[in-house]
Amino acid sequence: MFAGPPTPTNFEYAYAKRCMVALIEAYNKQYGMQYCYITPSNLYSELDTHKGGRAHYAASLLDKIIEQDSLGGSSIKLLGTGSPLRQFTYAGDIALVIKAMIDNNVWASFNVSNPENYSIHKLARITLDVNGKSDWTIDYSQPHMNGQARKDVSIDKFLQYFPEFVFTKFADGIKKVYIDKTK
């Protein structure tokens, strides 16, 4: 987490997260506390919103699909080239992890992420496919807006504590969110 500076596109958020980790570790050391933290990968859920032109990827993607569908469209426009790799975790899984930590008295800090690591293009394609829009096209505009090439998260430490945990597959979770947003 502390190796090199955060990526410029996410600098403030990433730096704040690093400060939180340093503070928690300092409290644990100075006061003998057992505070811990989990670091989730990109999250999505039924409660994610798209406001003021800014949104997390999954919410923005779904909003674009829903908007184009309402206009009778059959394509969506996305920034970049679709090549960056990302891991997305259904927010309900994070709630289950926190509950499991409490139930099992686990006070360790670790990353939590769905191990599925897909390109932005594949994530968009999955989202279209599971929602009955396999024939839709994706237009990538502004290739210079690609962002960081990959943001891999190791969950090896998490799996030491919860080796049997089953994450919601992206296809299943994004379909659930789409159904919720279109009802």
What residue ranges belong to the model's regions?
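Catalytic helix-loop patch of NAD(P)-dependent Rossmann-fold dehydrogenases
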Residues: 1-37, 42-52
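Short, hinge-like loop/turn segments at secondary-structure boundaries
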Residues: 54-56
